[in-house]
């Protein structure tokens, strides 16, 4: 099992001062969170979520990535990897290393990080994920979730609220999915790492009038925003980053957008590590948000009155666009060009609707 340790050294006086300052600030703001000041220096211990050791051994993706019917291993990765770049895939598909006499996968699935089970979907036909588990990781900054999908069965003793340890067996690999399932020969684990958009998901879902019941509450896939697990794992293995906070801090900005609002979304209250500067003591007047190529809002800057002067409340303004990356990620619609300027595209609009409650 892959597990690397890193011991960070801190100056006690400086750490104590930062803790006291953070605590004072949280009391002033009346907020229930603060960020551990040493979190940028801590190195995560994590594990690959299946018995397939190919990635740990440095072998190519064909040794572990389960392709679609196309047969292309790239189609099992994260990003615009399907339908000639026109379809987004929000995770990694990991093939099995063991099968029984019937050809069914026997691989056990491991918790990639210590955490708390937040959701288990036990009715495979109700989601494209099939049977899936979501684990939140409160000990990580920010508190990302990991998702494990297309499972055959859940391990006995694993339930919502269960605390799981690093590498603990949580399930068995399968090929469950809505809409008829996945052929046994293409059984795999679909693995995601990401952030939850909003605790107000039910309001957005009702407003959208999809015509079907939300069977999965907050852990509906539409409320989950993934990062590229392989990119993070590569950077972690190469020691370019030690943890998720460093990874988000180094993320590439593709679209920068301003939202004129006095709201502080629950998203940034849950993930305060994404703040680029402290919240003001009073109300905010707006937000400047940096998004990566898939629309993940990874950097947040609160704005004061002077920075949104003359702008209509609840309005959205594109500040900058890295056009080459937008073109490369054509499976995502982050912006639409309007002459010499840009407006929000469909995927960016959805993210802002979810997080800010814009309607």
What does each model-identified segment do?
Residues 95-98, 146-155, 175-180, 210-216:
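Short helix/strand-bridging catalytic loops that position acidic/His residues to coordinate divalent metals
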Residues 1-21:
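N-terminal secretory signal peptides that target proteins for export/translocation
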Residues 112, 158, 163-164:
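Short, well-ordered loop/turn sites that connect or cap secondary structure elements
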Residues 104-106, 112-155, 182-184, 188:
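Zn2+-dependent peptidoglycan hydrolase active-site motif and core
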Residues 96-98, 139, 153, 191, ...:
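Non-catalytic surface loops within mature trypsin-like serine protease
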